[in-house]
Amino acid sequence: YEYPQYYLVNPAAYAALGAYMFLLILVGFPINFLTLYVTIEHKKLRTPLNYILLNLAVANLFMVFGGFTTTMFTSIRGYFVLGHLGCNLEGFFATLSGEIALWSLVVLAIERWVVVCKPISNFRFGENHAIMGLAFTWTMAMACAAPPLVGWSRYIPEGMQCSCGIDYYTRAEGFNNESFVVYMFTCHFMTPLTIVFFCYGRLLCAVKEAAAAQQESETTQRAEREVTRMVVIMVIAFLICWCPYAGVAWFIFTHQGSEFGPVFMTIPAFFAKSSSIYNPMIYICLNKQFRHCMITTLCCGKKA
């Protein structure tokens, strides 16, 4: 917190991180804001499923304003100049955003499973279910991001010391880091991923069976396949962005006392931050209705 950490790596590396964060802000803010604005402006986009996708956009904006701006500033300065309070805020927003994204994918996976596999007959995913899903994602995300603020573990500068995360590195007395990390990985990483994989495993079987039996009309099957493909790609993108960070964090936690270079944790941590731009990009690329509405909005109401 007190002086530039240029003894860790070349100062040019800090400048590169600052430029990278500026790029994420430059892309992340407009694309997530546009997702929100277009959905609010076009009534036909205000479907229960899209509530969850909007939730991802809101979480990403939290990350942009609460995390990216802070990290860009500290990268330029070469150390976490904002002190302990700033570290808590940056670590909190990064963790909160990542967890909201993960639990939103859980809700989307359950929705796809219920709608396509029909384990509950005559069930329709409605507005009330979507609102309950939103409340669930925020509750679970807060249950992961808030404890370090009140003494169960803590947020500390990591890697090149210009961004903050959970303390996987030490067994500092009074913080119970070990129990929190086990709780976090079990309840807030492995459990949601297990639910997602279960839902999509059942989903793939149901889609194959329906196609073979021709139980639905071709139009309905195609629409369900498009939505399912979009959500599956979101899950894959999440795994690509966050699994390296989670894997390195767990490795550091289980090898405390060993020496690690500052870049070892910095690269996966900053790579994970790119998750704030991939969900809206996937949504825009794979959802024809949203893409049409977005073009209409950008063309000031003129149909493209």
Curated annotation (Swiss-Prot):
Motif ('Ionic lock' involved in activated form stabilization): 111-113
Stretches assigned to the Cytoplasmic side: 39-50, 111-129, 202-229, 286-304
Family membership: Belongs to the G-protein coupled receptor 1 family. Opsin subfamily.
A Pfam family hit: 7tm_1
Subcellular location: Membrane; Cell projection, Cilium, Photoreceptor outer segment
Residues with attached carbohydrate: N177
Site feature location: Plays an important role in the conformation switch to the active conformation: E90
Annotated lipid attachment (S-palmitoyl cysteine): C299, C300
Classification of source organism: Eukaryota, Metazoa, Chordata, Craniata, Vertebrata
Topological domain spans for side Extracellular: 1-13, 74-87, 151-179, 252-263
Spans through the membrane: 14-38, 51-73, 88-110, 130-150, 180-201, 230-251, 264-285
Residue positions where N6-(retinylidene)lysine is found in the record: K273
Name this polypeptide is given: Rhodopsin
Record-linked InterPro entries: GPCR_opsins, GPCR_Rhodpsn, GPCR_Rhodpsn_7TM, Opsin, Retinal_BS, Rhodopsin
Cross-referenced Gene3D superfamilies: Rhodopsin 7-helix transmembrane proteins
